[in-house]
């Protein structure tokens, strides 16, 4: 079975509940794999290096720790000289040489925009990679997928991805700023480390899952604009997840939210 240890919400940020994870590992010897998402979906929060290492250093556990970094290219750091792309430096990949039980997974589906090729990558020490190679299906990567992956991971492809990611990060900043002016929207939750924004929908000043669902259906069915209703997920009461688009797409979403949430019957 699955042992679930919910994230904790500290203010607007989601984080691993390290003490409870360690307690679960100490008391349940049946656990063989730990999955951590950094950044998470829909939390949009990058996990701290300290929390990942705390799990890796657990003396009561010798199974695998798998860190899913599907959204790793979207966080940023605020620097004195402006915005700096830091996707590589915040990855857990550089911990792999120090931990034989660590596997870090990434994908071409998000920042590279190649979801159709269905291709990802795992970083781990050679013995673990050998086990994966021994158990995977033969010829599991098609020739077209391999071709597009090689193009994406070329110096030119990575430069293009980084340029697009910088644009998205700026669009995300503008979207968050614009959402602050929408009536009956509450806090933006998470650290906004992914290509989406998680925001609370309010009724009478409190997060309302019912109203979030109403707005979600109105946007999709009446206006053809799809966001994600995440209000049923733990810690996400009343929340919609809005993917970051172009400035024009973001402006349309903000205008529609303003229209719907300014209407008491929405």
Which sequence ranges carry the predicted segments?
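Active-site phosphate-binding strand-loop segment of PLP-dependent enzymes
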Residues: 12-79, 83-84
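Conserved PLP-binding catalytic core of the aspartate aminotransferase-like
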Residues: 168-169, 181-223, 240, 244
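PLP-dependent enzyme catalytic core of the Aspartate aminotransferase-like
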Residues: 50, 208, 221-222, 232-266
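PLP-dependent aminotransferase class I/II
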Residues: 95, 101-181, 187-189
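Conserved active-site segment immediately N-terminal to the catalytic lysine
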Residues: 63, 78-109, 127-131, 240
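Short acidic/glycine-enriched loop/turn segments that link adjacent beta-strands
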Residues: 116, 193-195, 234-237
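Short beta->alpha connector loops at strand-helix junctions that form conserved
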Residues: 5-11
